[in-house]
């Protein structure tokens, strides 16, 4: 995975994530939309055969797009940890 910043402003961030597809894009965008201060979050895959996605984040100024992205990643990490614990509990 390689991440490049395509555009960065005080309340807007556009990233290209190489080596990923809809699986990660949908998870990140959906999680971002639940964060207070995020006005818009989306992703798209420029071409069906490419293995890269473009993520766009727009905030209302109460949080920076970078902080919103970091918070989304922490939320995803927490969700996956919870699911791992639940699955481990099922196998006992």
Curated annotation (Swiss-Prot):
Its EC number is 2.7.7.6. Signal peptide: none annotated. GO terms for biological process: DNA-templated transcription. Keywords: Cytoplasm, DNA-directed RNA polymerase, Nucleotidyltransferase, Transcription, Transferase. GO terms for cellular component: cytoplasm; DNA-directed RNA polymerase complex. It is an enzyme of class 2 (transferase). It is found in: Cytoplasm. One of its GO terms (molecular function) is DNA-directed RNA polymerase activity. It comes from the Archaea. InterPro entries: RBP11-like, RBP11-like_dimer, RNA_pol_Rpb11_13-16kDa_CS, Rpo11-like. It catalyses: RNA(n) + a ribonucleoside 5'-triphosphate = RNA(n+1) + diphosphate. Part of the 13-subunit RNA polymerase complex. DNA-dependent RNA polymerase (RNAP) catalyzes the transcription of DNA into RNA using the four ribonucleoside triphosphates as substrates. Belongs to the archaeal Rpo11/eukaryotic RPB11/RPC19 RNA polymerase subunit family. This is DNA-directed RNA polymerase subunit Rpo11.
């Amino acid at each position: 995975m390689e991440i490049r910043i395509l555009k960065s402003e005080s309340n807007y961030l556009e990233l290209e994530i190489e080596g990923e597809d809809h699986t990660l894009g949908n998870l990140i965008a959906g999680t971002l939309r639940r964060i207070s201060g995020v006005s818009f979050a989306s992703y798209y895959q420029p071409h069906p055969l490419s293995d890269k996605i473009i993520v766009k984040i727009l905030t209302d100024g109460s949080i920076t797009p970078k902080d919103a992205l970091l918070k989304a990643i922490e939320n995803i990490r927490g969700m996956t940890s919870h699911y791992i614990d639940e699955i481990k509990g099922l196998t006992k």
